[in-house]
Structures are given as structure tokens and as C-alpha cells.
């Protein structure tokens, strides 16, 4: 997240083994769990065993899979002791989301899931189209993400080159020119 990489069960098990051996807790951001492509399998970190589950703080929400950004509905699952501490902190740091947002999230999570699958297919088609087009641009490359809806582009081939009278010295320069000349917004990193 947000590179779109999907860890295999074996990779997660290796991470889990280290975490259990050293008593490390993991915050597992599973917000993109329903947006996995190309027959990749999403594996929840907490599903890897009781020891792992005890050390996992799972966070998720409805903003990505259900296109409910702005509704501000997220949730967490953890062992009871951690959940109590988080609930105490939350009760003093923020107010509750609106009632309508809560009911909308319940409906999204418990209702028919067909629309989410249609949205996922559209995201996958857009990803394929974007990656194919990006990799045809000289000086640009990108890896096909296995999940989420971002594409991380490598534009190092443009560094030091002049475009539209401006020398591209950084990712920020490239992003600004891309926005001004191509009307495409990017986030340099």
C-alpha cells in the first residue's frame, strides 16, 4: 500500500515468524483487501495463526473497496487488551462518525457485493490500460500493480532532459510539467 504489491502467504508467514520470535506487533492495513487482481490471493495477516493474531492490529474501512471516501468510516480488530486501549483513546480524541455514515457502511459491508466486483473489474481494466500506455513512453517504466488502484511510475529516464524549455531535475519538476502540459496530476515520491 499504495504500491499495489500483494504479499504471498509464504512471504507473510516469514514476516510473522520474525514478529512472533521478537514479540513484535504488526499493524495490518487491509484497506485494499477486495481490490486484488490477476488471480492473486489476499491473505489476512491475522489469519496466519493464534500467535500472529494476538500480535496483529488489523485496520480497514469502506473508503476504497466501497468507494466511500469522505464517509470517514474505518474499523480495527485486535486482541481485547489493545482494543480497550484504542477505544479509550478514540473516545477522548475524536467524535463518532455521523449516523448516516455508519448505516451506509453497514449496508455496504452486509449487502450485495456485485457492484464492488464491477468496480474492481473497471479498476483492473484501467490499470492494464495505464500500465500498457506508460510502458510505451520512452524514459518511463512501471510495474503492473497486483492490487489497489495506483501505478508507481519510474521517470528517471527524463532526469537531465529538457522538455518544453525546462530541464527536468527532479520528480517534482516532472510532476509539475506533466500537470501543466498533459493535465495529468501525479504525486512525486
Regions found by a protein language model. Give the residues of each.
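PLP-dependent class I/II
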Residues: 1-189
Amino acid at each position: 500500500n499504495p504500491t499495489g504489491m500483494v504479499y504471498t502467504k509464504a512471504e507473510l508467514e516469514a514476516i510473522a515468524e520474525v514478529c512472533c520470535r521478537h514479540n513484535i506487533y504488526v499493524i495490518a492495513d487491509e484497506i485494499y483487501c477486495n481490490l486484488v487482481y490477476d488471480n492473486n490471493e489476499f491473505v489476512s495477516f491475522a489469519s496466519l495463526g493464534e500467535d500472529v493474531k494476538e500480535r496483529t492490529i488489523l485496520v480497514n474501512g469502506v473508503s476504497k473497496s466501497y468507494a466511500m471516501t469522505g464517509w470517514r468510516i474505518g474499523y480495527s480488530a485486535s486482541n481485547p487488551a489493545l482494543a480497550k486501549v484504542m477505544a479509550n483513546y478514540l473516545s477522548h480524541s475524536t467524535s463518532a462518525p455521523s449516523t448516516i455514515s455508519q448505516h451506509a457502511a453497514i449496508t455496504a459491508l452486509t449487502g450485495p457485493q456485485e457492484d464492488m466486483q464491477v468496480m474492481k473489474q473497471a479498476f483492473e481494466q484501467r490499470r492494464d490500460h495505464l500500465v500498457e500506455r506508460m510502458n510505451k513512453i520512452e524514459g518511463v517504466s512501471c510495474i503492473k500493480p497486483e492490487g489497489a488502484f495506483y501505478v508507481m511510475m519510474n521517470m528517471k529516464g527524463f532526469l537531465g532532459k529538457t522538455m518544453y524549455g525546462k530541464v527536468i531535475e527532479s520528480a517534482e519538476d516532472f510532476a509539475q510539467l506533466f500537470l501543466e502540459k498533459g493535465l495529468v496530476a501525479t504525486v512525486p515520491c
